[in-house]
């Protein structure tokens, strides 16, 4: 099952050239970029690990691609995304985020039905990947 999170998530994976163009777009807008990774693909997992520090004031797409490639090399079986932050209003908020790497095999999710009081049905999404310890999921 293909995880769909962020901009361009329903499109085929971006090529390095397309990623560079998106980086240039973010730089032209004055956004700061950062690289994050995780092995827990749950849709509500918004706390991914940061790869280094955010790349404030970096104006060269090659420098950001260098960080993306370094993260891909070390975390090749992880989900990796590139985030662009817009701080024009004084409060940083994500303006764009998209995946730049994903594991070779994505096991998907199970939907569990849970009975609550008064026969109320509740549902829970659980990633098959999280059944293994962190760092050994893919």
Swiss-Prot record:
Entry keywords, A to Z: Calvin cycle, Carbon dioxide fixation, Chloroplast, Photorespiration, Photosynthesis, Plastid
GO cellular component, one term: chloroplast
Classification via SMART domains: RuBisCO_small (SM00961)
GO molecular function, one term: ribulose-bisphosphate carboxylase activity
Biological processes annotated in GO: reductive pentose-phosphate cycle
Matching Pfam families: RuBisCO_small
Subcellular location: Plastid, Chloroplast
InterPro entries, alphabetized: RuBisCO_ssu, RuBisCO_ssu_dom, RuBisCO_ssu_sf
Keyword Chloroplast carried by entry: yes
Family note: Belongs to the RuBisCO small chain family.
Assembly and binders: Heterohexadecamer of 8 large and 8 small subunits.
Function per UniProt: RuBisCO catalyzes two reactions: the carboxylation of D-ribulose 1,5-bisphosphate, the primary event in carbon dioxide fixation, as well as the oxidative fragmentation of the pentose substrate in the photorespiration process. Both reactions occur simultaneously and in competition at the same active site. Although the small subunit is not catalytic it is essential for maximal activity.
Other remarks in the entry: In this alga, in contrast to plants, the small subunit is encoded in the chloroplast.
Protein name per UniProt: Ribulose bisphosphate carboxylase small subunit
